[in-house]
Each structure stands twice: as C-alpha cells, then as structure tokens.
C-alpha cells in the first residue's frame, strides 16, 4: 500500500510547565519545528486559555501541526501530519519534544490515504 501522508500522534509528559503556558513561545516552537522538518508554513493560529493552557495550529502546504497543552499536568498533545515524501514529521515531533523539555513521550504513527498504487499529487 502507498500512503499519501504520515500522521504522528504524540503524548508528551513531564514538560516544562512555564513553557506550556507561554503562547508566544509555543507558537515559535511549533513554527520552527515545521520549518526544521522542511515544511512550508501557510497560516498560524494560537490561543491562550484562562487560567492556563495553549492550543494552536500551524497550517503547512503539506498538511498541519497542532498542539494542546495542560500546564498543570506538564502534558501536551501534539499532532504532526505531513503529506508527500519531502517533509519528515519525526523531525518536527522530536524538536517539539526537546523544546518542551518532555521527560518522556509516547507516539503512534498512522499512514493516511492508503492506495494500492502510487498516487501523484500536485506539489507533493
């Protein structure tokens, strides 16, 4: 089977609580992770919750990256979905894990868009 893309679902534990509650820093980390993976950033939207927590999305030409943080638990839920062969979602995921100072993570990789024959998609 041939996949259109790879979707990394990451559970990050033991993260730096101050980082998890800093909207500007979370946004910077997410955008930098996309760029380090070789993605082309299109749109960025992040929100700081009261009293704590940040959620955000980085829309890339190749799909998206998302994060939802729970500073009180030292936990972040991260998705990195990339289409095509040019961008490596693991580079982004590993960078995010390092920058959030996670003590450990669990991940699942899902192949998205499975076809029996290779599919040619424009710009990927």
Curated annotation (Swiss-Prot):
The modification Pyruvic acid (Ser) is found at residue 63. The keyword S-adenosyl-L-methionine applies. One of its GO terms (cellular component) is cytosol. It catalyses: S-adenosyl-L-methionine + H(+) = S-adenosyl 3-(methylsulfanyl)propylamine + CO2. The record marks 62-63 as: Cleavage (non-hydrolytic). GO terms for molecular function: adenosylmethionine decarboxylase activity. InterPro entries: AdoMetDC_C, AdoMetDC_fam_prok, AdoMetDC_N, S-AdoMet_deCO2ase_core, S-AdoMet_deCOase_pro-enz. Pathway: Amine and polyamine biosynthesis; S-adenosylmethioninamine biosynthesis; S-adenosylmethioninamine from S-adenosyl-L-methionine: step 1/1. Its cofactor is pyruvate. Is synthesized initially as an inactive proenzyme. Formation of the active enzyme involves a self-maturation process in which the active site pyruvoyl group is generated from an internal serine residue via an autocatalytic post-translational modification. Two non-identical subunits are generated from the proenzyme in this reaction, and the pyruvate is formed at the N-terminus of the alpha chain, which is derived from the carboxyl end of the proenzyme. GO terms for biological process: spermidine biosynthetic process. Binds 1 pyruvoyl group covalently per subunit. Its EC number is 4.1.1.50. Keywords: Autocatalytic cleavage, Decarboxylase, Lyase, Polyamine biosynthesis, Pyruvate, S-adenosyl-L-methionine, Schiff base, Spermidine biosynthesis, Zymogen. The active site is at 63 (schiff-base intermediate with substrate), 68 (proton acceptor), 83 (proton donor). The keyword Cell inner membrane does not apply. Pfam families: AdoMet_dc. Belongs to the prokaryotic AdoMetDC family. Type 1 subfamily. Catalyzes the decarboxylation of S-adenosylmethionine to S-adenosylmethioninamine (dcAdoMet), the propylamine donor required for the synthesis of the polyamines spermine and spermidine from the diamine putrescine. HAMAP family: AdoMetDC_1. Heterotetramer of two alpha and two beta chains arranged as a dimer of alpha/beta heterodimers. This is S-adenosylmethionine decarboxylase proenzyme.
